[in-house]
Amino acid sequence: MKKIILLICILIGVSSCDMIAEDIQESKNYFEDKKIRKNQNKIGLELLEKNTEKILWNRMELRIPKNSKINEVNGRLEYDGQALEIEFKYIPNKNNDDICFDVSTSFKEWYKKRNNELYLMYSNNFQSTKSNMRLAEKIAKENGFIECKNGLI
């Protein structure tokens, strides 16, 4: 493959070689992202049917799909090593009422306040991972999260 690219670069000029390499890398990234999203959607569909289990997350009991977990570093829901398009955030000592975004976003947002602690949950609205959005809606409902009404883009 590299020899073919090198031959093409020689034929069309050296300055185009960077552009071709860049296009190839962008193409690889696109197909890798597509593969990840397809896997996320498949897992989301599977988890919609699974039973839930209670976990303790930042001093709050949460019901999430069985055998899934919340990544401690980035807050994403994970199953079988795959991060889904569902993210949790914890904000201690949140005293004001500015919780939801004022503008429409490309993700849905839910919140739950307890004492002066704020628990947030987000789910991206990607067309290719709709099952993750449905799973997030189910998790939000089961755990008493309130949906922000800022709307999706």
Language-model features, listed with the residues they occupy:
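A short, hydrophobic, proline-anchored segment that marks a local hinge/packing element in signaling
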Residues: K108-N115
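N-terminal targeting sequences that direct proteins away from the cytosol to non-cytosolic compartments
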Residues: C17-L84, Y90-I91, R114, N124-I153
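Short, Gly/Ser/Thr-enriched beta-strand-loop segments that form substrate-interacting elements
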Residues: A83-F107
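Classical Sec-dependent N-terminal signal peptides that target proteins to the secretory pathway
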Residues: M1-A21
